[in-house]
Amino acid sequence: MSLAFSLRRNGAQVLVVERGEPGREASHAAAGMLADLDPHTPEALRPLALASARLYPEFVHDVQDESGSHVDLRDDGTIQLPDPTAAPGAFATPITDEGGVQTLEPSLSYTGVAFLLKERAVDPRALIAAMLKAAKHREIEVASGSAATELMVSKDRVQGVRTAKSDYHAPVVVNCAGAWAGKFGAGGAPTKPVKGQMLALIAPRRDLLRHVVRAPEVYLVPRSDGRIVVGSTSEDAGFDKRVDPDTIQRLHQKAADLVPELGQARRLEAWAGLRPGTPDELPILGRGEVDGYFVAAGHYRNGILLAPITAVVMTQLIRGMQPEIELGAFGVDRF
């Protein structure tokens, strides 16, 4: 939706063809960590991640201004606990206060070494709802309830897309189908679903947690309304979005191990989403094999984070400009 918004602002007529209800797949399921400094971020992705994080305050401001809706963007930062699989990185600041990590978050049971990252977090559901309002304000059309199944091509040039309900004609098509991008006929991209189960707890008190807390096996993302989002699994389960009660219980217990007061916290909701993975865990951003066809998919864990910069560089590419960030590592032809 960020790309649709950007293209419309640059004068294009935009139609979003959505397989289901807009914004109800990976974006709806995401935790909303804007983890540009995560030590697990591939180095090839770092320039995009850092650039997108810098764009976020203005991006959210524009969406709020266009929609009249509030988006919960928090800048309290992330407490990163040590992870044996990844060094903290140059952007991490060791927490050296005499009281350690509990100086920042007294509710944490953890007392060892930790690092503070200057990251933000956003409520993805509030963001998507506001973007849909902004899209309506910008007169972006949305055709929902029927997936694009085929790229229509004539003489090596895009003519539009076909769904079970209708054909939509357009000189430019962008495959933004996430985990379903590979199902887009001959114009598919090698994405696959990576299942993640999560839950939301009601904090026993509003000030229980201010920072995002990221540990090797669990993360906690506080919302301004008192919810705490707990995640997440990473499962190769195809397109299965069923929630397993035992898995949710394990996540809840891991959260309580970090913040004991969460042990008795009420569960508001549990859900599963499908991250759009790729073979090298990097997004696919670039031109397709025929004129007028582009791909912006496979953002894996970073779809919410990368929304602003994806809109910028793909708009530049579609308009025939040189993208401000080199996209060679993300091309469709690398597979």
Enumerate the language-model features and the residues they cover:
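C-terminal catalytic lobe of FAD-dependent flavoproteins
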Residues: 124, 259-335
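Dinucleotide-binding Rossmann-like beta1-alpha1 core, especially the glycine-rich loop
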Residues: 32-104, 110-111, 254-256
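Short loop/edge segments at beta-strand edges and connector loops
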Residues: 18, 97, 144-146, 269-271
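A short, glycine/Asx- and small/polar-enriched loop/turn
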Residues: 104-111, 152-159, 276-281, 288-291
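Glycine-rich FAD pyrophosphate-binding loop
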Residues: 8-29
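Active-site substrate-recognition segment that forms the wall
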Residues: 2-10, 32-34, 38, 69-74, ...
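Helical element adjacent to the flavin cofactor pocket in flavoenzyme catalytic cores
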Residues: 114-172, 176
